[in-house]
Amino acid sequence: MSTSTLIVRALAVFAALIASGCVTRPPTIAHVHVGHALTAVHVTPGQAGYLLVAEERAVAVRDLAQKASVDTNLPQIKTDVAAAVAATVSDDSFGLRHSIVQASNHITFAATSDDASANIRASAPQFARDIVRVVERCELIGLLGKDVDTTTNVQEAQTLASEIAKLAQQNIDGEDADGDGLVGGKPAEYGMKQLRARLSEMIAREDPPYRTVDQTYLFNLVRLPNGKWVFDKFKRGGNIEGYK
């Protein structure tokens, strides 16, 4: 069989593989950054995506605060509120505030990638504005937690814990700040539920469609000294810079 015949057959096989979907292209750099927000990133607890961590923390804070609000043991109230505050504002343990900010940062990384779609470029700055109310509630929870830590009165501690629980619930579901009957109807009322919806809408608008990114790409994206992001072919794990 001639060399030319082998080449023709090889090209035919390759074309068939492409047509059948057996050969896939690597995801865009922009979509990998989106994947860090939505799916997985190698530096978080359980390597979960930043948005997933934020959602988990939001629920944990609510549960701890609700428990503290009905407890009658002051030391236990303080212990539970301290844990709720840590799950809210701690950077080292990926609290809610830190995790949602990092989710937004990675959507911004996606938007500034050379291969970002117009959709992602337009959505990133809006999402950065959308997270503001959640961050503000986190700050308030931190301040209320300090008051719980210093009080010597059980009833006061319970009342403060109830306020924290209310803010924590709003960080999950949103709030109706203007009394129009709509919870989370505008960015100033958003919680994690609305933020998840905004990112889902962004993903739905992507063309070509966004596909869930494999961990091979999610965990091996590195940033070069010139600021460019590339895949590490040696799979040594992503550069920590820009990931925390």
Predicted ranges, named:
Residues 2-11:
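Bacterial N-terminal signal peptides that target proteins for export
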Residues 6, 23-24:
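Non-globular terminal segments
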Residues 18-21:
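C-terminal motif of bacterial Sec signal peptides marking the signal peptidase cleavage site
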Residues 25-244:
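Mature extracytoplasmic or organellar-lumen-exposed domains after removal of signal/transit peptides
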